[in-house]
Each structure stands twice: as C-alpha cells, then as structure tokens.
Amino acid sequence: VLMIALTITLCDQFASHVCKPIFTRFRPTHHPDFMDQVKVVFGYRGGKYGFISSHAANSFGFAMLLALIFRNRWLTGSLFLWATLNAYSRIYLGVHFITDIIPGALSGLFFGWVVYRLYRLGVVRWHLPEESVWLSTRKAHVMAVAIVGVIVFLFVLADPLVSVLK
C-alpha cells in the first residue's frame, strides 16, 4: 500500500506541479482558438493547463507497479485495459489532447518502474518476506475478473448512469 501511495504521489506531483506549470499548454476546453467548439460533459472543463495528464500518469503508474509486483498476465492485462480506458476517458471528455495522454502514460510507467525498483531494494536489503505480497494465481484471476467486470458493468450501465446524474 505504501508503494502504491508513493507511485501515485510521484506521478501526480510530477504532472501537476512540475509539467503543467512549466509547459502551460491549454487544455482543449481552454484553448482560445477552439474552446467554444469542444463539446463538454456536464459543463466540466478541467483546470487551465493539461500537459501532461495526471490521470494517465496515475493510472499507468499504478498498473505498472502492480504488474511488476504480481507478475500475473491476467491481472496485468486487466490493469492496463483499465488504465487505457481511464486515459481515453480524458480525451472523450475533451479535457486532454492525445499528446497530453501519451507523455502522461509514459511518465506513469517510468515512476511505476522506479518505485518497483525501490521496493525490490527494500525486499533484498531488509530481508522482507516476499510471499506476503505475491498473489496466488487464483486470487490474481479473481482480481482480473473483478476489474474487467467493473469495466463491462460501467459500459453496460453508462447511459442509465448518465441519465441519473443529469
């Protein structure tokens, strides 16, 4: 849990407090040339700047860390499917360009890998029991099915949920 928190913190702080203030690239919903042409959902426009996407960084950082720790192809596939859909949703909502998403995803992959390396150093240095964090194949499959199940559930119920939220 500590490694997940560290990954999300690094990804989010890098995207929000390093990249966005340095690059100051407008989101599609704030770009003066075409902000009026961007269709927004529920009036949500996001903050002023969008490079790089924090959602993409956080999602891919989380997926990378867990994929490296648990090393289960079904869990890895479902985590990266979730991360990809989460990142795509930012484009769909009109709050990011694809060129915000890809660098965000890449930075997330990097920070997920860095935190995994720190985790491995801790396991070796302090002789931590690895067995306590490794998932059995059955548990990993259950987690993968749960993640995919939530994704399918949200796709099936997307229209009714939006109707309720309106």
Located regions from the model:
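Transmembrane alpha-helix/helix-exit interface in multi-pass inner-membrane proteins
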Residues: 9-29
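Interfacial segments of alpha-helical transmembrane regions
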Residues: 1-14, 76-77
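Membrane-embedded catalytic cores of phosphoryl/pyrophosphoryl-handling enzymes
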Residues: 39-165
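Alpha-helical transmembrane-segment detector that highlights a single hydrophobic TM helix
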Residues: 29-37
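Residue-level detector of alpha-helical recognition elements and their boundaries
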Residues: 3, 33-34, 81, 99
